[in-house]
Amino acid sequence: MSEAEARPSNFIRQIIDKDLADGTHSSVHTRFPPEPNGYLHIGHAKSICLNFGIAQDYQGQCNLRFDDTNPEKEDVEYVESIKNDVSWLGFEWSGDICYSSNYFDTLYAYAVELINKGLAYVDELSPDQIREYRGTLKEPGKASPYRDRSPEENLALFEKMRDGGFEEGKACLRAKIDMSSSFMVMRDPVIYRVRFAHHHQTADKWCIYPMYDFTHCISDALEGITHSICTLEFQDNRRLYDWVLDNITIDCQPRQYEFSRLNLEYTVMSKRKLNQLVVENLVEGWDDPRMPTISGLRRRGFTSSSIREFCKRIGVTKQENMIEFGSLESCIRDDLNENAPRAMAVLDPIKVVIENYDADTVETLTVANHPNKPEMGTREVPFTREVWIERDDFREEANKKYKRLVLGKEVRLRGAYVIKAERIEKDAEGNITTIFCSYDNETLGKNPADGRKVKGVIHWVSADKALPAEIRLYDRLFTVPNPAAADDFAATLNPESLVTLNGFVEPSLAEGVAEQAYQFERTGYFCVDSKDSKADALVFNRTVGLRDTWGKTEA
C-alpha cells in the first residue's frame, strides 16, 4: 500500500491510541478471520483495510486466520481465493496463515475445563427443542432437563460425542450461563456439535466441531490479539466472548470492538443471496463483473488502490447507513482518469469513406497515451481512407448544441484531420450504412488555414486496421437501491446490467494484458477481460463511465 495514502482517524484508532498511551498494550495485534465458505466481497474489503491498515500504521501485526469450524460449507478453493484477494488488495499477513482448526485440541481441552467447573453440559434435546426452550426476547428460556448433570457424567458424554457415539443432532455441548438472560446469546449457547464431515485441514480426525462464539475468542487469545474488531451484528456476542475468556485458564484477554458493516446501494452482501445468484445462473459466477465480490470487481477493472480509497472515504463508525454506489464508482473513476492510458474504440460503428483520401495510403499518426502525462509516452495509430465512427456521432440534421458530425458540416477526427460529411448511403429500411466525407489535408495537428472554426472532435478507428472486439457494458446489478429489502430480491435484477456489443478497437490494444485498463476516449473506462479475452478474440469490460449518468437521460 502506498505511503501517500493518508492515515485515517476513527473511534477504533482513538481506542488504540489510548491503550498505547496508558500502557494497556505496548503494541497492536489485529486479525482478519474470514470463514472459507465463499468469496470475499466489498464489505470484507472494509474489514481487511481496517485490520491490516491498523497493523500497518501502528507497526503492529495482523493475522490472516481462517475460521474453519463448519466443514460442510468450507473448501480449499475459498481459502486460496481469500489469500489472493488479501494480497491483491495490497496487504501482507503476519507470519504463517492461521486456522481455527489448528487449535481444535486446545479448544477441546478448554471445553473439558468448563465441564469440570460445572459451566458446560451435554444436552440431548433436539435442535428444535433447544430453540423452543430458549424462549423469546419477551419470554425467558427454561432449563433443559439435562442441565444439571454432574461434571463426571458430562465428561463421559462429551468423550462419547468425540468418539462418534452420538448421531448428528442427538447431542451437543452447551455453556451453562443464564436461561433468563435478556441477551439470547447468553441462554446456554451451544459450543460444540456433532458433524460427521471431512475437514479440509484436519481430514477425519474430528466428528465434533466447536461453534464460532466459542472458537473465536479463544483463537484471539491464543494468537495474542489485542483488538478484536468485528461488525455490529456481533455486539451482543461480546458478552459471550468475555464470558468464555473469563472462565477458562488463559493469559491473554483481548477486547472486542464493533463497527458498522458496509451497506452498498444496488447490490447485496448476503452470502446466501450471492450464492443464489450464482446457483440459479442469474450471474455468470462469483467473479462475474457485476458481483460485489473482490474477484468480480477486479475482473470488472477496479484497482486495489481504488477499493482502499473507497474504504478510507466511507470511514469507520458505529452508525449503519447505505453508501451510494456512485461513491465506489467515483474512486475508480478518479484512479483511472489519472493512470489509465487513452485509446480509441468504436462500440456502435458506422463507416465513413473519405473520398478524396488515397485508397492505398496508410498513414501512421502519433498520439499521446495521456493528455496530461507525457511520461506515459505515445502510440502509433493507423489512418486510412475508410474509418469507423460511432453511430451516435452523426446526424443528418442537428441544432447548434450538437458538436459532432452533421451532413454538410465539419468535425475533427481525434488526433487526425478535419472531415466534412458530403452525402450518405442508406439501406432499404432507411438506415444509414455509409457516410461519404471529404477531408482537409492541411489540418493534421492544426486548425484550418482560412481560420474557420471546427468545434467538434470525435473518435474513430481505421476500418482496415482496427481489431474486432467484444465490448461488455456492465452496469448496476439491481434496479433499486436496496434490493435486499424486496420480497423477492431477484425480481429487482437489472435486465440491462450487461449489454454486449461488437465493436472495433485500435490495433495497439492487441498488446493489452489481462486487467489492463484503458480510457476509451469519450466513452468510458474499460479493461481487458481476464477470463475470456484472447489475442484473436479481444474482450473488454466497461469498468465505469466517464461520468455518473445513472438515472439520467440525455437532454
Swiss-Prot record:
One GO term under biological process is: glutaminyl-tRNA aminoacylation
Q: Which domain of life is it from?
A: Bacteria
Instruction: Give residues annotated as binding L-glutamine.
Output: 67, 212
Q: Which Pfam families match?
A: tRNA-synt_1c, tRNA-synt_1c_C, tRNA-synt_1c_C2
**Intervals of motif 'KMSKS' region:** 268-272
Kindly report the protein's main subcellular placement as a broad class: cytoplasm
Catalyzed reactions per annotation: tRNA(Gln) + L-glutamine + ATP = L-glutaminyl-tRNA(Gln) + AMP + diphosphate
Localization, UniProt: Cytoplasm
Annotated GO molecular function terms are: ATP binding; glutamine-tRNA ligase activity
What is its EC class? Answer: ligase
Q: Which NCBIfam families match?
A: glnS, PRK14703.1
**Family indicated by similarity:** Belongs to the class-I aminoacyl-tRNA synthetase family.
Name of this protein: Glutamine--tRNA ligase
Q: Which organism is it from?
A: Vibrio atlanticus (strain LGP32) (Vibrio splendidus (strain Mel32))
> Which lineage?
Bacteria, Pseudomonadati, Pseudomonadota, Gammaproteobacteria, Vibrionales
The gene for this chain is glnS
